[in-house]
Regions:
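An N-terminal-biased, well-structured beta-alpha scaffold segment characteristic
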Residues: 1-78, 211-213, 223, 234, ...
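NAD(P)-dependent dehydrogenase/reductase Rossmann-like domain
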Residues: 250, 263, 271-387
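Glycine-rich Rossmann-fold phosphate-binding loop(s) that bind the pyrophosphate
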Residues: 143-144
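Rossmann-like adenosine-cofactor binding region
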Residues: 42-44, 166-260, 274
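N-terminal Rossmann-fold NAD(P) dinucleotide-binding loop
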Residues: 147-148
Length: 387
């Protein structure tokens, strides 16, 4: 029986995927698996029995990845599960920036007691007139699951779309419309595009990437959209550019005191993935990834350990070893197992940066003596008996 703790409310559609071998517990200290959305785990004590953390969403800056890796705790996320929900809001944000619908709605609210509101509207509506997006140039920075969907939809709206991503995956490239023009220098997007939307992860290299220097290279009157991470934009620089007219609109899904209520800012209360469909998709994907790992040791969509899949174990035992990515580890593992007179029927070893993951199918059930012997090897973080 595996126990699962939910640090945030998780969609029932996802939790319903759990079989009778699972129990949801309110006590994290009893859990082998944790499901989380936005709750911060950085200050939490991670119990020794915790095996996996699954984030129902893409961003994982609320999870201590290195700490988990050192403890042999696999962290999963759900890339692409909420992509359509975010894409739709990005398109909505772009349309709201093109036409002052928000301002018009506020005028209607303020004029609700005017008996001649319809007549007044005909006079006032020119204040809220805008432009169409058809024929305009959109630059998409980051061609992951969301960026690709935004680019493809913008093409269908008649926009001229430019995409930039030096690390674009093969899968993303296959899904990208042929009408999207791929550029190799982000400054081409800065110089040419009327709208710029960013869809990159928050890293040291991307933090504050939309700053005074970048904005100075953009077209006058550019519209900036940020539905990825709040810290990707230096919002003080963005506000200065709004005041000067260099930036026409800044659309963000991340409310904060800097931009809330500021002229030219359209700030949405983090609704990108807040659809029933997105929450259901993320929950299902997170639960399925966690179940496959807990039951079989397979790793899919982890952000701190390499992908690894050996299917369902057909042998008497399966062992998973978390260790440093250094030389001679495999030789030591096989030597210890051989000394116990146990035959290895299948094995795989994968690495990611400074850590590695080894799974071994053995023809005898793993004993406590074997586990302790493997655990004593220098460089091993954790030994887990999967079966």
């Amino acid at each position: 029986m595996f126990q699962i703790n939910c640090l945030n409310p998780i969609s029932k559609v996802g939790l319903d995927r759990l079989t009778a071998d699972y129990k949801v517990t309110d006590n994290m200290n009893d859990a082998e698996g944790v499901l989380v959305r936005s709750a911060s785990m950085h200050e939490l004590e991670l119990p020794e029995n915790l095996l996996a953390v699954a984030r129902a969403g893409a961003g994982v800056n609320n999870i201590p990845l290195d700490k988990c890796a050192e403890k042999g705790i696999v962290v999963f996320n759900t890339p692409g599960a909420n992509a359509n929900g975010v894409k739709e809001l990005v398109i909505a944000g772009m349309l709201l920036a093109a036409r002052d619908v928000v301002g018009g709605i506020e005028w209607v609210k303020a004029s609700k007691d005017n008996a001649d509101i319809a007549k007044a509207a005909e006079k006032e509506k020119k204040k809220f007139a805008g432009t169409e997006v058809m024929g305009k140039k959109l630059g998409v920075i980051g061609l992951g699951a969301i960026g690709v969907k935004v680019a493809n939809t913008a093409v269908s709206l008649g926009m001229e779309v430019y995409g930039y991503d030096p690390y674009v995956s093969v899968n993303a490239a296959w899904n990208l419309s042929r009408s999207v023009k791929h550029v190799t220098n982000v400054e081409e997007i800065y110089a040419d595009c009327d709208y710029i939307t960013i869809h990159v992860p928050l890293l040291d290299s991307t933090k504050g990437m939309i700053n005074k220097e970048a904005i100075s290279k953009m077209k006058d009157g550019v519209v900036l959209l940020n539905f990825a991470r709040d810290l990707l934009a230096n919002e003080a620089d963005v506000l200065a550019a709004l005041k000067s007219g260099k930036v026409a609109r800044y659309v963000s899904d991340f409310p904060n005191p800097t931009t809330a209520g500021q002229p030219g800012c359209i700030v949405i209360p983090h609704l990108g993935a807040s659809t029933e469909e997105s929450e259901d998709n993320c929950a299902k994907m997170a639960v399925e990834e966690m179940m496959d790992y807990l039951e079989n040791g397979n790793i899919r969509n982890s952000v701190n350990y390499p992908a690894c899949d050996m299917g369902v174990c057909s042998q008497a035992g399966r062992i998973a070893i978390f260790h440093k990515n250094i030389a001679n580890m495999l030789n030591q593992f096989t030597a210890v197992i051989g000394e116990k007179n146990i035959n290895i029927s299948d094995m795989t070893n994968k690495s990611r940066g400074e850590v590695a993951y080894t799974m071994l199918d053995i023809e005898n059930a793993a004993t406590q003596d074997l586990v302790e012997s493997l655990q004593k090897i220098d460089g091993v973080f954790r030994v887990r008996v999967v079966k």
